[in-house]
Amino acid sequence: MNRKFLRYIPFVKRLYPSIVKKIFFIFNIGEISFKFFNVNFLLNINEPMERDILLFDYYENEQINFLIQNLKNENFDYFFDIGANSGLYSLIIGNLFSSIKIKSFEPINISIKKFKNNL
């Protein structure tokens, strides 16, 4: 089922995450592995970015597709991900473009840990 359309229904957009969060809480589910742009990520329902990916299969999809398209059309040696957070962009680009060297920077320790867990 394509869950992306659920983001556009106001009532569902608010209710759906609440119900899923409660289910995760009841069953004591912390992180769950989920494939996004053909890369596996460990996602936490309590993190807004990760919740959007998990529930709606969506997070900055237009920006990611724009980046992928432009990287396909040009010849780049490096990709710099400043403020990499959990590594979303770095891992997607690294998965699609093995010849590009990825340099990721993230100053926040908890985000660095998440990034390392996603490697």
Feature locations, PLM:
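S-adenosyl-L-methionine
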Residues: M1-N118
